[in-house]
């Protein structure tokens, strides 16, 4: 079965790269539409997939269609292609705030609809994607979607009511992690370390720590305690972070992001 993407920006490119690396699809089984010939040329050169400037061609030639345009263009695109959509199609939205009900309504007929929220680490094969689907999507079809998202990271199926939480803890949080890495590196530079080297130490520390959580199954608090020797330097750093509201700031940032996302539901 062929697969289609309407739009092929950074996220779609990351998704397609993962599928190709995992061998889920061949290059000639993936068709993408771009707004310009320049964009089509980039997609062909970077990914080697079939390209077109016509969104209708994507829908006519595939049964699994990913909407990979910016959120503000979703309605325009769906209005353009809805006459070509059939009950055999599955439409997948990857934008925050576009609910399953809204997507199905804009498709103009009862259809299989999926929402997913990938994040930018998908670009290096370490994405985290939350997925939900309407009742028309079978378990087998949902498993196929999850196989695709697993090709560029990890996947969790969640009820739609949790998609804002997914967006906050997974979609938004890379920005906060990058801020933390930058702050750690700044501190190392203040201690005399060259900046490039400081970024390596800070980023690898976060990468390794995250892998410990995922691969050991241990509670993050337990892993933290393993590093904190009595009266040592690490527990002193923990004390200062707590004194300055580190945990509370993270909590409020994620809650604030989720609340903001809830305001754009349509």
Q: At which residue positions do the language-model features occur?
A:
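Rossmann-like NAD(P)(H) cofactor-binding subdomain of soluble oxidoreductases
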Residues: 37, 46-47, 55-60, 64-131, ...
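A short glycine-threonine-serine/GTX helix/turn-capping micro-motif
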Residues: 166-175, 196, 224
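Internal alpha-helical scaffold of NAD(P)-dependent oxidoreductase catalytic cores
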Residues: 102-112, 128-165, 178-215
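Hydrophobic residues within alpha-helices
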Residues: 15-16, 81, 184
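C-terminal substrate-binding/catalytic lobe of Rossmann-fold NAD(P)-dependent oxidoreductases
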Residues: 191-255
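NAD(P)+-binding Rossmann beta1-loop-alpha1 motif at the extreme N-terminus of oxidoreductases
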Residues: 1-46, 50-53, 189-191
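Conserved small/polar residues in nucleotide/adenosyl-binding loops
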Residues: 264-266
